[in-house]
Structure formats: C-alpha cells, structure tokens
C-alpha cells in the first residue's frame, strides 16, 4: 500500500511541474516511471510473497538457480546484462520459425530478395513485395504457420517477394538512407521484373520499411515511374510531430552523443535499440523476467515472438544519423524537398498510388496519430 501511495504521489508531483517543454515533460514522466517500476516490491526477495514461499519450499535453491541464470545472462551479453526472455534453444530459423518455402533470387550489399514458392494451382499475375524494417529481422512476418503473414499471402495466390536486410558491419558504415532505397525496394522491383516478366507490383511496407516505401513512392512519382500499383503500410509513421515516448531518446544532446558513438564504431549495436524498446514496456520486458529468472530461479518459456525480439540487428552509422536527423527530428517527410534521395527532392504530396494504412491504438512505438 505504501508503494502504491508513494507512486501516486510522485506521479501527481511530476504531473504538476510547471515550465517544462513537452519533450522535457515526457522525459520526466518516463524516467519517473522507470524508477517506480524498478522499486516495485515484487522485484525484491523480501517483499515478494511468491519468492519468499519458493525460497522456503526449495531451501533457497531458487536463489542459487537465479544466480546461475544471472551469470549466464552476463556471459551472453559479454559483461552487459542481456536478460533471457525465452528459451532460445527451442527455435531455429528455417526449422521451426520462418519455415514458409522460398529461395533467394537476388542479393546485394544491403539485402537478399526471397521469392516464396506458390502453394496454389493459380497465382495472381501481379507480384507482391514486402519491405520489412531493418531494425530487426524479416521473419516476424513468418514466425509460425498459424500466424505467418507470409504464408497467408502465399496461400491466397500471391507471388510473394520479401526483402531480408543484411545485418551490417563497419564496412557498411557509409551506407545512407538513399542507399537503402536504391539497394532495397528499387533493386527489388528490378529483380522482380527479371524473375516474373511483370513490371507492375503491389507493395507492403512495415515500420521503418514502410517509411522507406513512402519516401520511395515519392521518389518514383517524381521520376514518373508508375510500377507500384498499390501500397499497404503497417505501423508506419509519416507525420512524426507526435512520436510518443520515443521522443525521450531523441533530443539534441543524445543525438550528438549517438553520432560520436557510431562515428567510432561504424554502426549502432543491436542491443541499444533493444534496450530502448524494452524500457518502453519495462514491466513486461524487463522486471517480469528479473523476477522469473533471477528471484524465482525459473527458465523463461519458449515464445517465438520474444525469440525474434531478441534477434536484434546493427544499424549503419550514416543511415542512422540521416534517419534520426532528417526524418525524426526534422519531420522531413512532411516538409516538401527537405529530404533529398539520390538527387531527388522528396514530396509525398505527389504520391498518387492507392494506399492503405494499418495503425493500432495501443502501439507505443509507432503511435497511430503519426500514420
């Protein structure tokens, strides 16, 4: 009760602070919540009844097993705590996740293009291209047959192609956002035409892959290229005026620090993005596993989505800075000509492609109001 009362009091005090701009207020709210979540009684042995009961019944074996789990996670993270969220040994890409049959028909420095085998006697004439994000792996669209968007599309007669982005190392540090356009969707469109003989395609963009497709459609419109006949967007932000809690991590001071870091490394390590996303759902993605793994001494259950979530990717330095500066900080897609890709000023007002946007009310990463 005292914790709940204190939490409410801190929340009310924080909410009444005057003179803060919206971004600073978002930070105060966010980090106050992080502190309160960390201090919850359930996160401590002596104030968690379930942990006390387990400790008494097992003679403390749960705490010893929890210590083993903690040390294993520190070892996996090479000194950085990488909390296990699922039994990663239970999954293998191509074996029990990402199992829809297909093959790579084209590749370049930034991606491989997968063409999936048809499962119907007849297929639609116009191919379908999926452009997923490169902040994580493509197979979130193909986890299990029962929840695979890829399998669903193939089973409905679509000749499906999916971009699988490379996990970049330092040698790709100079790859920019426009390189992702040239070597991603534009290269894929050419490869699809070579493979099928069909010039016209439908596309689906997801997350940052959707943002890339919005910019690409504006680029194609400026070029008079009408190959893309329809576009569907999932969790895709266009107007980044209101980006919710993500704004906590994107201010001038943090961007300068990030620029210095990636200039030295050549890329942003995957765990930085993973940590940010986990902090936005800290009770579900951090503290529940701290209690389960380290206090109760249990192993996490197999869960395909969390296996994918833990399979993080790196981001090239130049692309990341352009993306965060031009698109996030400057809201560049909403400013005609502010973003220039391959010499072409991007103006999304010129897009005439029929488009459908799917945005969910509770999406904390891509708020629906920004779609």
Residue ranges and their predicted role:
Residues 309-345, 353:
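Mobile cap/lid helix-loop segments that gate and shape the active-site cleft of serine hydrolases
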Residues 6, 14-56, 60-63, 194, ...:
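Alpha/beta-hydrolase-fold enzymes
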């Amino acid at each position: 009760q005292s914790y709940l009362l204190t939490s409410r009091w801190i929340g009310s005090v924080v909410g009444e602070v005057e003179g803060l701009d919206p971004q600073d207020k978002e930070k105060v709210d966010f980090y106050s919540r992080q502190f309160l979540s960390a201090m919850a009684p359930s996160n401590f042995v002596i104030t968690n009844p379930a942990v006390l009961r387990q400790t008494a019944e097992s003679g403390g074996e749960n705490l010893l097993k929890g210590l083993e789990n903690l040390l294993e996670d520190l070892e996996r993270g090479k000194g950085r705590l990488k909390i296990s969220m699922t039994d990663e040994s239970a999954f293998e890409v191509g074996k029990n996740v990402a199992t829809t049959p297909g093959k790579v028909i084209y590749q370049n420095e930034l991606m491989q293009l997968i063409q999936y085998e048809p499962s119907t006697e007849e297929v639609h004439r116009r191919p379908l291209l999926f452009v997923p994000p490169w902040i994580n792996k493509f197979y979130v669209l193909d986890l299990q047959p029962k929840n695979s968007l890829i399998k669903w599309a193939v089973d409905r007669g679509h000749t499906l192609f999916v971009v699988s982005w490379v996990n970049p190392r330092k040698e790709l540090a100079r790859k920019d956002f426009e390189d992702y356009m040239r070597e991603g969707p534009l290269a894929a469109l050419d490869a699809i035409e070579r493979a099928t003989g069909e010039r016209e395609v439908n596309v689906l963009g997801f997350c940052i892959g959707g943002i890339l497709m919005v910019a690409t459609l504006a680029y194609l419109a400026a070029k008079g290229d009408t190959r893309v006949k329809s576009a569907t967007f999932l969790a895709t932000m266009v107007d980044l005026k209101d980006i919710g809690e993500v704004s906590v991590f994107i201010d001038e001071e943090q961007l300068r620090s990030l620029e210095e870091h990636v200039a030295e490394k050549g890329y942003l390590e995957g765990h930085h993005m993973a940590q940010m996303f986990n902090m936005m759902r800290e009770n579900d993605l951090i503290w529940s596993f701290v209690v389960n793994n380290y206090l109760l001494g249990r192993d996490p259950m197999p869960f395909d989505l969390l296996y994918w979530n833990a399979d993080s990717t790196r981001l090239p330095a130049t692309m990341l800075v352009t993306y965060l500066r031009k698109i996030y900080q400057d809201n560049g897609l909403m400013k005609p000509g502010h973003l220039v890709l391959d010499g072409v000023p991007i103006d999304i007002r010129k897009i005439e492609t029929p488009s459908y946007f799917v945005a969910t009310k509770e999406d904390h990463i891509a708020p629906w109001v920004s779609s």
